[in-house]
Amino acid sequence: MKKIALFSLIILVGGCREIAGERVKGSGHVITENRTASGFNNVDISGAIDVYVKQDSVSSVKVEADDNILEYIQVHSDGSTLEIYTENNIRLKPTNKIKVYISNPQYKEIQVSGASTIRCENEITSADAIDIGLSGASDGRLELNAPKISVHLTGASNTSIKGKTKDFEGSASGASEIRGFDLLSENANVDASGASHIEIFASVKIDGQSSGASSVNYKGNAQSSVEKSGASSVNKKD
């Protein structure tokens, strides 16, 4: 009797695990679907998605994926933040990477996580500050123009960034990397930790810190007061 009960328990637990981790394999028929969203200034992406962001006069969201996977890709807007994510407990195996194309007149904050990528299809300009966050081995290629730009990376994420700003604030931790020589900033504040790397251009001043086995490389004629500790480094590049 005990053996039967134990066997039944194993079957039950195994079944629960299978349900909790349902796997959906792409059909191979990739299509594009329009989703309804408007009135947002912030974007929050998670779940191994390739995101293409464009500044345009009209708001739109298009999702490209296998036809049997589209239903598991959620798009919601609460009036200020557009959220795009894959359903919990569903393991998707798309034929190709899931792609999302976003157009909007204005962007203030973009958060990307879970091995997702973000690409700017044109230069994103703003009269206000722009805040970018990447985590969980995410990747970015950014083109921004705003009075203040903040970029924060964690968890082995990396991004390249170009454009123009007066004040740049950048942090990288957990073996992350910011490549920002092509972002023309006047003032820069940086924080590199945990074997991370930051590259930045600054024409007036640059401050902050570099710790652990991290490095900060900068171009421009900025006065530097970046503090370093441990095996970290701070270097001016030509």
Question: What are the language-model segments listed below?
Answer:
Residues 2-9:
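Sec-dependent signal peptide hydrophobic core
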Residues 4, 16-70, 87-103, 119-120, ...:
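Short acidic/polar N-terminal linker immediately downstream of export determinants
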Residues 33-34, 40-53, 100-102, 106-238:
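Extended, compositionally simple hydrophobic/Ser/Thr-rich segments
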Residues 73-75:
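Solvent-exposed adhesion/ligand-recognition segments of exported proteins
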Residues 78-79:
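Short acidic-glycine loop/turn motifs at beta-strand connectors
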Residues 85-88, 201:
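Generic short beta-strand segments
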